[in-house]
Regions:
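Intrinsic disorder at enzyme termini
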Residues: 1-8
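Glycine-rich flavin
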Residues: 21, 26-129
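Conserved S/T- and glycine-rich ATP-binding loop of Class I adenylate-forming
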Residues: 9, 20
């Protein structure tokens, strides 16, 4: 059994690392942390161009159809840069949740989420929320 990352995984990781270093320098990160938005739309847009929001979405829905291992490599790079944003809740929680459903309206939401056109997150409801 092989436990090493593939060349494709490492190349994608390196591309995200380079992108994050370019679009999210420390001054930009400080501005986001001090602001009210909680993420940098410009950085999110660049990540979306690379397919990161839809990394776990099936290719038929416009996603990359990759695995959780691939996503962890990307999350690690975003964490290394302290990039604020909805990556975990969007790409690791919401997109796979949408992908597990069915129906035309759900497919449309999944496609929009996979492309990064919309941001999706999970919310809690109920007395303990």
């Amino acid at each position: 059994m092989r436990f090493a990352f593939s060349e494709d995984q490492l190349a994608f990781r390196d591309a995200v690392r380079d992108l994050v270093a370019k679009v999210a320098p420390p001054a930009t990160l400080r501005a986001v942390w001090d602001g009210r938005r909680g993420y940098d739309p410009r950085a999110w847009s660049h990540l979306a161009e690379m397919g990161v929001p839809g990394l776990l979405a099936p290719e038929a829905a416009g996603g990359l159809g990759l695995t959780e291992v691939d996503l962890v490599l990307i999350m690690e790079e975003c964490g290394r840069a302290a990039l604020p944003g909805p990556l975990v809740e969007h790409a690791a929680v919401a997109v796979p949740t949408l992908a597990g459903g069915s129906g035309d309206s759900l497919t449309a939401w999944l496609q929009a989420a996979a492309s990064g056109e919309i941001l999706v997150s999970a919310g809690l409801d109920g007395p303990a929320a």
